[in-house]
């Protein structure tokens, strides 16, 4: 019996997000608002990996991630890699990192925080622990764990 393989076509131009934590691909599509963008998107889930047991991969045609989207991606899957594709070749490889200060991408869960009540006040968080992903609002000092992070 011959083995049937599912093959995903290479993209001419766009972004490939590789080494995503397994099971995080859908959440990344949602947070980055990619699923309704009108462009072709491929999501591969639980793909075998040499570096990590399993991984997700996202391919987005004709689009490159903004700096703000890359910051959100770092919070969702810090070990992910972003590859910019131009004319079917990798033109640029980006290793993402969680910034020490996270500005304007995460909502503070404290309803009384100044960042939720003052116009023009951007949210700012300090990275407390990169392994368990714990952040702290610099205004109200509220600590937020990974599972409670809400993106703006």
Name each model-derived stretch.
Residues 2-94:
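Interaction interfaces in information-processing and related assembly proteins
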Residues 88-152:
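Cys/His-clustered metal-coordination modules, chiefly Zn-binding fingers
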